[in-house]
Amino acid sequence: MTDSIPKKPLKKGSLVFVDRGNYIKSIEALASDNDLPNYVFEGPGEILSVKDEYAQVRWRRPVPDVWFKLDQLKEYIQ
């Protein structure tokens, strides 16, 4: 039996950042630009929508919203 705290699911309104290790190993990284800007890895971005295993993320910059797999995102904690 483990005493770990259960992980909260990411949902609309959650603040997140992209986990560099999970993203680089993903098939999505192979199909995308391999030079993502640092702000996606530093956060925070806000989840606007969740569909199946993907989340639409908006950054606090004048850039388009982006879809990431939920397993590539981590909760942003200050």
Swiss-Prot record:
| E.C. numbers | 7.1.1.-
Please name the top-level EC class of this enzyme.
Answer: translocase
Q: Where in the cell is it found?
A: Cellular thylakoid membrane
Q: Name one GO molecular function term.
A: oxidoreductase activity, acting on NAD(P)H, quinone or similar compound as acceptor
In Pfam terms, one family for this protein is: NdhO
Instruction: Tell me the membrane topology, using the record's own terms.
Output: Peripheral membrane protein
Q: Name one GO cellular component term.
A: plasma membrane-derived thylakoid membrane
Keyword Ligase (UniProt): no
Spell out the reaction equation it catalyses: a plastoquinone + NADH + (n+1) H(+)(in) = a plastoquinol + NAD(+) + n H(+)(out); a plastoquinone + NADPH + (n+1) H(+)(in) = a plastoquinol + NADP(+) + n H(+)(out)
What are the UniProt keywords, alphabetically? Membrane, NAD, NADP, Plastoquinone, Quinone, Thylakoid, Translocase, Transport
Protein purpose: NDH-1 shuttles electrons from an unknown electron donor, via FMN and iron-sulfur (Fe-S) centers, to quinones in the respiratory and/or the photosynthetic chain. The immediate electron acceptor for the enzyme in this species is believed to be plastoquinone. Couples the redox reaction to proton translocation, and thus conserves the redox energy in a proton gradient. Cyanobacterial NDH-1 also plays a role in inorganic carbon-concentration.
The entry's family comment says: Belongs to the complex I NdhO subunit family.
Show the HAMAP family listed in the entry. Answer: NDH1_NDH1O
Q: How does it assemble?
A: NDH-1 can be composed of about 15 different subunits; different subcomplexes with different compositions have been identified which probably have different functions.
**What is the name listed in the Swiss-Prot or TrEMBL entry for this protein?**
NAD(P)H-quinone oxidoreductase subunit O
Q: Which organism is it from?
A: Prochlorococcus marinus (strain MIT 9312)
